[in-house]
Amino acid sequence: MTPLLITLLIVAGIALLIVIGYLNNVVENGKIERVRTRIELADRLRRCGEITETFPGQFMSPALKLLLTRLELNLNQRQLAVDKHNAELKARITELEGLIALGDQIPVNNPPNPIHTEVKAKDVRFLLEAMHNQVTRAAQEGFLPAVEAKHWVKEIRHILVLLHIEFFNNLGQQALQKNQPGQARLAFERGVQYLRKQPEPKVYEEQLTYLEKLLARANAQVMDRMAPAEDEHNELTDGLKTDEEETWKKKVMYD
């Protein structure tokens, strides 16, 4: 065997090892990518399902329910492409396709969930943020047209405003029921200020007028409490009158 042939065999062997290593790396990267995709899609599906199931009914419209169902269907179809033999995914896809076929008649079974506490308001706000992320991600991936995505981003912001209106209104009404006009005034005042800062305040003109009336009512109750009645006598008012009389007598004596 000539030295040239030996050299060629060595070079061929090295090249073969490089090719094998490259192919193994490609296969391994493909497996890792599939696992990563499966985990990411599962997380997005979980978040989408959480929004669909727990979003308060007073903010959930058939159009919004239909959007969330479409987003969930898209994620399930992509996950099925990675896990082709998953019977559970196939069944869910069939169910979602049936719901989407109903269009605006899609059932909305979310019960109303009044926003009475700041904790509850934050929970719903987090759901809205998750919804916003789902919409923008779907637009970036080409599933949602840009015009439709823009519409839903605006609608999500509108729902956020409605959330604040309900929160401040409920907070103030609770304070009035507890005979705490000061706390009620603070809640209504926050609501009024929030609406006045909106980019399009005319959209919420009716709600603003309503909160302003409640603010005036709470403020009147606070002022009534602060002003003593004309015929009311207590230790403080009597003490003040006594001090005024003593001061007047001393002034007369020294003058």
PLM feature spans:
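Repeat-mediated protein-protein interaction surfaces in helical alpha-solenoids
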Residues: 17-22, 133-157
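Helix-turn-helix repeat elements of alpha-solenoid scaffolds
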Residues: 61-71, 139-147, 188
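N-terminal topogenic membrane-targeting module
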Residues: 23-128, 132-135
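TPR-adjacent "capping" and linker segments in tetratricopeptide-repeat scaffold/adaptor proteins
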Residues: 32-35, 148-167
